[in-house]
Amino acid sequence: MIGPKPTLEDIVLDLQPFPQPQPVDLMCYEQLSDSSEDEDEVDHHHNNQQQHHQHARPEVPEDGDCYRIVSDCYSCGKPLRLVVVSSHEELRVLEDLLMGTLDIVCPSCASRV
């Protein structure tokens, strides 16, 4: 703009239509190495993890269900949430223990014990 007032000659309008979007190739042309040694290492690591999990987790009983238990920390009183897989009868035993003399502490209180 030249001068104190705008004129039509000062305003440049680009009235051409916007260009249409162009297709983009999203394919990845990366070549993976065919190393059976890498696969053996992955399989060996996977098998070790499966064996560890098999020892860490007992078999879930066929009549077992998942239950959420909310209790308070014995030391600080913060609410604790437990999830157990158990049969209905075993859950009743756990309930009796929690209502009786069995107390649970939170991880922060457990580290101070």
UniProtKB/Swiss-Prot annotation:
One of its GO terms (cellular component) is host cell nucleus. Its main location: host cell. A zinc finger (unnamed) spans 73-109. A motif (LXCXE motif) lies at residues 26-30. Keywords: Activator, DNA-binding, Early protein, G1/S host cell cycle checkpoint dysregulation by virus, Host cytoplasm, Host nucleus, Host-virus interaction, Inhibition of host innate immune response by virus, Inhibition of host interferon signaling pathway by virus, Interferon antiviral system evasion, Metal-binding, Modulation of host cell cycle by virus, Oncogene, Transcription, Transcription regulation, Viral immunoevasion, Zinc, Zinc-finger. Residues 1-47 are annotated as: E7 terminal domain. GO terms for molecular function: DNA binding; DNA-binding transcription factor activity; protein domain specific binding; zinc ion binding. Highly phosphorylated. Gene3D superfamilies: 3.30.160.330. Residues 30-62 are annotated as: Disordered. The keyword Mitochondrion does not apply. It comes from the Viruses. GO terms for biological process: DNA-templated transcription; symbiont-mediated perturbation of host cell cycle G1/S transition checkpoint; symbiont-mediated suppression of host innate immune response; symbiont-mediated suppression of host type I interferon-mediated signaling pathway. It is found in: Host cytoplasm; Host nucleus. Homodimer. Homooligomer. Interacts with host RB1; this interaction induces dissociation of RB1-E2F1 complex thereby disrupting RB1 activity. Interacts with host EP300; this interaction represses EP300 transcriptional activity. Interacts with protein E2; this interaction inhibits E7 oncogenic activity. Interacts with host TMEM173/STING; this interaction impairs the ability of TMEM173/STING to sense cytosolic DNA and promote the production of type I interferon (IFN-alpha and IFN-beta). Belongs to the papillomaviridae E7 protein family. The E7 terminal domain is an intrinsically disordered domain, whose flexibility and conformational transitions confer target adaptability to the oncoprotein. It allows adaptation to a variety of protein targets and exposes the PEST degradation sequence that regulates its turnover in the cell. This is Protein E7. It comes from Macaca mulata papillomavirus 1 (Rhpv 1).
